[in-house]
Curated annotation (Swiss-Prot):
Gene3D superfamilies: Urocanase like domains, Urocanase superfamily. It is found in: Cytoplasm. Its EC number is 4.2.1.49. Its cofactor is NAD(+). NAD(+) binds at residues 49-50, 127, 173-175, 193, 198, 239-240, 260-264, 270-271, 319, 489. Pathway: Amino-acid degradation; L-histidine degradation into L-glutamate; N-formimidoyl-L-glutamate from L-histidine: step 2/3. One of its GO terms (biological process) is L-histidine catabolic process to glutamate and formate. It comes from the Bacteria. This is Urocanate hydratase. It is an enzyme of class 4 (lyase). It holds the Pfam family Urocanase_C. It catalyses: 4-imidazolone-5-propanoate = trans-urocanate + H2O. The gene is hutU. The lineage of its organism: Bacteria, Bacillati, Bacillota, Bacilli, Bacillales.
Length: 552
C-alpha cells in the first residue's frame, strides 16, 4: 500500500485534463482540499476538524485521481469512506461522483468502533466538506461566524461588538475564522490556541492581528482596545482548560464566550491540560485510552469554567463542537445550561432556506471571483447586509488555494445566481467554469441534535430522514457530486448530513441542472422547518409556492 505523501497537482486554467468539466471540477476540488494553504495536514490527507480527510489513504487518493481522469460523461464513480469502489454507467445528467463517508449503523456509531475500523483501513472520517471535496479554507466558515457574532451583537449589544471582548479557543480550519468575524463586527477577541503554528498561520492569512504567550499581556491589550473602541484580535498561546480557570481566578470575565476546539474528537482534536504538543502526541500513540480519559477530564474543566463565566455575566454559547455533550458525559450536569449557536442565533436564516452557499473559480484567477462579486452587488443591491458582506470579504479575506467566495443566499436567490454565473461562463466573461457548493451545515441537509437541529420546535431534533431526502433529491436533480456523511462537526453518533456540489460550465444542460438543484436544495430546508412548525418557514413556503401536500 502506498502510504507516502505525494505532491498534489494544483490544476488551474482553462485546459481540460479529464474527459469533461464535471470530472475536472471534482479532480481540482479534491486537490484543492489538499492544497498546503488549505489543508491542516496535507501530508496525512487531513483537511480540517481533527482527522477530517479527503481520501482514505494515498493509494486511494491515487486511484481516485486516475479514475476521475478517465471517467466518461455518462459514468458515476462511487466513493466509500474515501476509497473508490466502483464505476457504473449511468447518464449525463446523473452525478459524476456519489460519496458516502463515515456512515455506521446507529448502535455501532461510536468513536471506539470507528477507531477499530480505521485501524483496519476500512473507514475514513470525512467531517463535512473534507471528504466531499468542497472545503475552501477558513473563508468557508467565516461568513457564518460573522453572521453568528452579528446576531450576538444585535441581541445583546445594540448591533455592534464595539467595546466588547470575546474569548474563544481553537484556531484550526473552522475556529480560525472566529477572530476575524469578531473584528469585522467591531469587537476585541482573545483566541486561545495550544499550537503556535496554527496561531502563526492565522496571522499569515490575516485572520488574526497579533499573538502573545502571556495571559496578562493578552488581557491588557484587549482591555486597552475595548476602552478605545478599537477592533483587535489576539492569539493567546495556551490550553483553554487551563487559561479559562486562570481568567476567573484573576477576575477577568469576557462579554462573550464560546469555543471551537475540536472537542468532538477527544483523541485527535483536544490536547489534555498540562501537556505539551509533543507529550500529547506520544501519549496518543502509546496509550490512546488514557489520552481520551485525560482529554475528556480537561474538556469537563473547560466547560465548568464556561458555566462559571456565564453565571458572572458572559454571553455564552456552544459553537457546534459537541463540547457540552462530552462534559455532560463526564458528569458536568449543567453542561447544557448555555445554548448552541443555531437555536440561539441562526435558525431564522434556515427558515428562509438561507445557508453557507459558496463558489470557486476553477481557473485559479482571482479576477473571476471579483467579477462574481460585482454580480452580487448589482443583482442583490436591495440586500444591504449581503452587499456589505461582499465588500468586507473583498477587502479583508485572503484566498487559500483556488479563489473562492462564500455568502448566505436563500431560496430563489441561489437559482438566480447560478443562472447568471452559468451565462457568464457561456459568454466567456469568466476564464473557466465555476464550482458551486455549500457546507453540510445548511437549512435542510443535516440532523444534529446538539447543533443544527438542537431544540426543534416539534421535538424532531434526531430525525435523520431529512439529510437522506436531501441527498436523494440532489442526486436526481443532477448535482455534479453528492455526499452523505456521519459525525461531522460533533463526532460519531451525533449527526447525519448531506452535501452537494454543482458545476456551472456554461452549457444549456448545466443551466437546467442548476435551476433544479439550486431550487430544490434550499427548498427542502424551508420544508424541513415548515414541517416542524416554524411560522417563518411556513410563510416562506407559501410565498415561494413550495408544494407541501399537508401544509395548512
Amino acid at each position: 500500500m502506498v502510504t507516502k505523501h505525494r505532491p498534489v497537482q494544483a490544476y488551474t486554467g482553462s485546459t481540460l485534463h479529464a474527459k469533461g468539466w464535471i470530472q475536472e471540477a471534482a479532480l481540482r476540488m479534491l486537490n484543492n482540499n489538499l492544497h498546503p494553504e488549505v489543508a491542516e495536514r496535507p501530508e496525512d490527507l487531513v483537511v480540517y476538524g481533527g482527522i477530517g480527510k479527503a481520501a482514505r489513504n494515498w493509494e486511494c487518493y491515487g486511484a481516485i485521481v486516475e479514475t476521475l481522469l478517465n471517467l466518461e460523461n455518462d459514468e458515476t464513480l462511487l466513493i466509500q469512506s474515501g476509497k473508490p469502489v466502483a464505476v457504473f454507467k449511468t447518464h449525463t445528467d446523473a452525478p459524476r461522483v456519489l460519496i458516502a463517508n463515515s456512515n455506521l449503523v446507529p448502535a455501532w456509531a461510536t468513536w471506539d468502533h470507528f477507531h477499530e475500523l480505521d485501524k483496519k483501513g476500512l473507514i475514513m472520517y470525512g467531517q463535512m466538506t473534507a471528504g466531499s471535496w468542497i472545503y475552501i479554507g477558513s473563508q468557508g466558515i467565516v461568513q457564518g461566524t460573522y453572521e453568528t457574532f452579528a446576531e450576538v451583537a444585535r441581541q445583546h449589544y445594540g448591533g455592534t461588538l464595539k467595546g466588547t471582548i470575546t474569548v474563544t479557543a481553537g484556531l484550526g480550519g473552522m475556529g480560525g475564522a472566529q477572530p476575524l468575524a469578531v473584528t469585522l463586527n467591531g469587537g476585541v477577541c482573545i483566541a486561545v490556541e495550544v499550537d503556535p503554528a496554527r496561531i502563526q498561520r492565522r496571522i499569515d492569512t490575516k485572520y488574526l492581528d497579533t499573538m502573545t504567550d502571556r495571559l496578562d499581556v493578552a488581557i491588557q491589550m484587549a482591555k486597552r482596545a475595548k476602552e478605545e473602541g478599537k477592533a483587535l484580535s489576539i492569539g493567546l498561546l495556551g490550553n483553554a482548560a487551563e487559561v479559562l480557570p486562570k481568567m476567573i481566578e484573576i477576575g477577568f470575565i469576557p462579554d462573550v464566550l464560546t469555543d471551537q476546539t475540536s472537542a468532538h474528537d477527544p483523541l485527535n482534536g483536544y490536547i489534555p491540560a498540562g501537556m505539551t504538543l509533543e507529550e500529547a502526541a506520544e501519549l496518543r500513540q502509546r496509550d490512546p485510552k488514557q489520552y481520551i480519559r485525560r482529554a475528556k477530564q480537561s474538556i469537563a474543566e473547560h466547560v465548568k469554567a464556561m458555566l462559571a463565566m456565564q453565571k458572572q455575566g458572559s454571553v455564552t454559547f456552544d459553537y457546534g463542537n459537541n463540547i457540552r455533550q462530552v462534559a455532560k458525559d463526564e458528569g458536568v450536569e449543567e453542561a447544557f445550561n448555555f445554548p448552541g449557536f443555531v437555536p440561539a442565533y441562526i435558525r431564522p436564516l434556515f427558515c428562509e432556506g438561507k445557508g453557507p452557499f459558496r463558489w470557486v473559480a476553477l481557473s485559479g484567477d482571482p479576477e473571476d471571483i471579483y467579477k462574481t462579486d460585482e454580480v452580487i452587488l448589482r443583482e442583490f443591491s436591495d440586500n444591504q447586509h449581503l452587499c456589505n458582506w461582499i465588500r468586507m470579504a473583498r477587502e479583508k479575506i485572503q484566498f487559500q488555494g483556488l479563489p473562492a467566495r462564500i455568502c448566505w443566499l436563500g431560496y430563489g436567490e441561489r437559482a438566480k445566481f447560478g443562472k447568471i454565473i452559468n451565462d457568464m461562463v457561456a459568454k466567456g466573461e469568466l476564464k473557466a467554469p465555476i464550482v458551486i457548493g455549500r457546507d453540510h451545515l445548511d437549512s435542510g441537509s443535516v440532523a444534529s441534535p446538539n447543533r443544527e437541529t438542537e431544540g426543534m420546535k416539534d421535538g424532531s431534533d434526531a430525525i435523520a430522514d431529512w439529510p437522506i431526502l436531501n441527498a436523494l433529491l440532489n442526486a436526481v436533480g443532477g448535482a455534479s457530486w453528492v455526499s452523505v456523511h456521519h459525525g461531522g462537526g460533533v463526532g460519531m453518533g451525533y449527526s447525519i448530513h448531506a452535501g452537494m456540489v454543482i458545476v456551472a460550465d456554461g452549457t444549456k444542460e448545466a443551466e437546467k441542472r442548476l435551476e433544479r438543484v439550486l431550487t430544490t436544495d434550499p427548498g427542502l430546508g424551508v420544508v424541513r422547518h415548515a414541517d416542524a412548525g416554524y411560522e417563518l418557514a411556513i410563510k416562506t413556503a407559501k410565498e415561494k409556492g413550495i408544494h407541501m401536500p399537508m401544509l395548512k
